[in-house]
Amino acid sequence: MYGACWNDYAEYRISDCQEPGRVICENGDDTLSLSTERLQSAGNVISDTFGFAIGETEQAKTPVAVSGRVLAYPYESREEFKKNIGRPVCSGPNGTVSIMTDKEYRDKGYCAIGTISAVPEYETWGEGNIPVNGRIWIKVF
């Protein structure tokens, strides 16, 4: 376990991607892979902002946010995300998060990862000076 001075709660999983801020989706065999398109189900975000993390093993080395806020790479422009604070997001190409339309959320709500929380203007975050790298804050479900 790690100290509780950070943003989200994470669990370690087996994944083919370890880059914080990327969306990875369940494969159905207890592993996760980088998202390749919009509206893939069972999406998760790799975290480098977690306060607590559980489940690390020799195989499970990727911290995935399960609650709280996490920095994620946006598919649409940061300006578009600023206009849509509070809206749901889903997976996008190349491990990004994408803004869901009302119809998509009604028809495929199970594809939602969380909601848009903030679009930071700062370059680093927290006492650990975590690089933001153009990411946005998502409140994960």
Walk through the language-model features, giving the residues of each:
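Extracellular receptor-binding modules and their adjoining Ser/Thr/Gly/Asp/Asn-rich linkers
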Residues: 1-141
